[in-house]
A protein has these predicted regions:
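Short glycine/serine/proline-enriched coil/turn segments at secondary-structure junctions
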Residues: 87-89, 115-116, 183-185, 227, ...
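Glycine-rich, acidic and aromatic/proline-enriched surface loops and short helix-turn segments
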Residues: 44-52, 101, 273, 298-302
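Predominantly five- to eight-bladed beta-propeller fold
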Residues: 1-57, 239-254, 307-316
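Beta-propeller fold detector
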Residues: 56-59, 104-109, 153-158, 200-204, ...
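Conserved beta-propeller blade repeats
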Residues: 1, 21-25, 29-44, 61-85, ...
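Structural motif
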Residues: 4-10, 42-44, 89-96, 139-144, ...
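Serine-hydrolase catalytic core recognition
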Residues: 77, 209-329
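Short loop/turn segments that connect beta-strands within beta-propeller blades
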Residues: 49-53, 98-102, 147-151, 194-197, ...
Length: 329
């Protein structure tokens, strides 16, 4: 990327000026989010030319109450990627802005009858001739491959499962790497699809796998855990072969073996609308079906907040269950 330009967001601090007299003692605090009836934040993207010291505002066709959730550098110094959302967050636009002319060109639009998930922004990666995109346009989160001109090259993944993370593209052999919940909505595994479309599962253990690939895409460090397995960290090559085990947590497992730790149990249930959902429960260690116990339920249901996962952890809920309280999620 050219070093001639730097990019920044003006930060909205409210319509009223700050009160300097209150800076040393508790007083009024100015929030960037307006209350009902007050004007919405006005956002822009600007570039600053280091040589000429000129600041330019990009001619971005953004709704007056729209959002700019991300800006990203591409491999082309004349193409700054700007991502926008409308106020209802059900329409996503990707623009390429020229930092000198300030012109912005719409490269793609993705819409949802519900809302656009945040992980879409963070899974867009740019290469010299292509860029990646996650979309739920067919009802499931899948990986799409575009030219830098905004043309769809191909849909990389297919099926009744969700791609969770796009890990990267090997420019040498044309392979794509990603994680998905193809095995189970509770789990996350690592996959590779080569340029001929052949899919290979790289992770060996069932649970939650979180890989971090090298820049060359030849190696990755994998963090794995499951309901009954604390985090295991390994170094792997891009065929999935384990080259070295970095962290085993054997000492932790040995220590925990001396305690009666409440364990999560997975279950499924069906809503009145016929939708099958997953849940977990945690009972006291010496649970007896003939006794009555206080029950607590954890519930959030916000976007991007999946709570029922095949992953390891000890939490406040574990402590409360050890006191004789049952939990449901």
């Amino acid at each position: 990327m050219s070093q001639k330009f730097s990019y920044s967001f003006p930060v909205f601090a409210g319509q009223a000026p700050r009160i300097d007299a209150l800076k040393d003692y508790p007083g009024e605090y100015t929030y960037k989010y307006p209350k009902a009836g007050y004007p919405n934040s006005k956002v822009e993207v600007r570039t600053y030319d280091i040589k000429s010291h000129v600041t330019r505002t990009m001619k971005l066709p953004l709704d007056a109450d729209g959002y700019i959730p991300r800006i990203r550098f591409t491999k082309d110094a004349n193409k700054l990627a700007i991502m926008t959302l409308n106020r209802h967050q059900d329409r996503f636009d990707l623009y390429f802005a020229d930092p000198r002319s300030t012109l912005c060109k719409l490269m793609l639009r993705d819409e949802s009858p519900y809302y656009i998930k945040e992980n879409i922004f963070d899974n867009i990666q740019f290469y010299p001739e292509y860029f990646s995109m996650l979309s739920e346009r067919d009802g499931y989160s899948h990986l799409y491959w575009y030219s830098m001109g905004g043309n769809l090259i191909k849909k990389v993944t297919n099926g009744k499962f969700e791609v969770k993370d796009f890990l990267g593209y090997d420019e040498e052999d044309g392979s794509f790497y990603y994680t998905s919940n193809e095995e189970s909505p509770l789990r996350k595994a690592v996959y590779k699809i080569d340029k001929k479309g052949k899919k290979t599962k790289l992770s060996q253990q069932a649970g939650t796998n979180t890989p971090l690939f090298s820049k060359s895409m030849k190696y990755y460090m994998n963090k794995f855990s499951s309901l009954d397995t604390p985090m295991l960290v390994t170094l792997n090559d891009n065929s999935g072969k384990t080259l070295k085990t970095l962290i085993t947590n054997d000492a932790l497992k040995q220590t925990l073996s001396g305690y009666a730790v409440p364990q999560k149990e997975f279950f499924t249930f069906q809503t009145t609308d016929g939708v099958k959902l997953n849940g977990w429960m945690m009972k006291p260690v010496n649970f007896s079906a003939s006794k009555k116990y206080p029950v607590l339920m954890y519930q959030y249901s916000g976007p991007g907040s999946q709570q029922v996962l095949d992953t390891w952890g000890i939490s406040w809920e574990t402590y409360m269950a050890s006191l004789g309280i049952s939990w449901y999620v």
